[in-house]
Swiss-Prot record:
This is Small ribosomal subunit protein uS11c. One of its GO terms (cellular component) is ribonucleoprotein complex. Keywords: Chloroplast, Plastid, Ribonucleoprotein, Ribosomal protein, RNA-binding, rRNA-binding. The gene is rps11. Belongs to the universal ribosomal protein uS11 family. PROSITE patterns: RIBOSOMAL_S11.
Length: 130
């Protein structure tokens, strides 16, 4: 007789999450959107590159919007209704990603800009000559 083997990674005992944190990391070349629970466990992530955008199109606002929509879709499926948003970086997709999260219907607890600012740290790269 064969014994039944307990499945590893069974989704039956998955804990219910009601509140999450969305991190938007917007660089000049790409936008990465990560959704975690309040403990920091990653629920879902997406980036402009993972959505199929290549090269310079990854830094566009539309690519950031697509990445944010993918993460929000996963959060809605999990039943998460309230999120905190942490935005980091100087990229063009940061405002578009925030606008997409606002329009989605998920309640925002707060929005925080966590872009690291140097207190006159490293020397910046030289000016670009085109």
């Amino acid at each position: 007789m064969s014994k039944t083997i307990k499945r590893i990674g069974s989704r039956r005992n998955e804990h219910r999450v009601l509140k999450g944190v969305i991190y938007v990391q917007a660089s000049f070349n790409n936008t990465i959107v990560t959704a975690t629970d309040v403990r920091g466990q990653v629920i879902s992530w997406s980036s402009a590159g993972a959505c199929g955008f290549k090269g310079t199109r990854r830094g566009t606002p539309f690519a950031a919007q697509t990445a944010a929509e993918n993460v929000i879709r996963t959060l809605m499926d999990r039943g998460i209704g309230r999120v905190e948003v942490m935005i980091s970086g100087p990229g063009r997709g940061r405002d578009t990603a925030l606008r997409t999260i606002r329009r989605s219907g998920i309640l925002l607890s707060f929005v925080r800009d966590v872009t690291p600012m140097p207190h006159n740290g490293c020397r910046p790269p030289k000016k670009r000559r085109v």
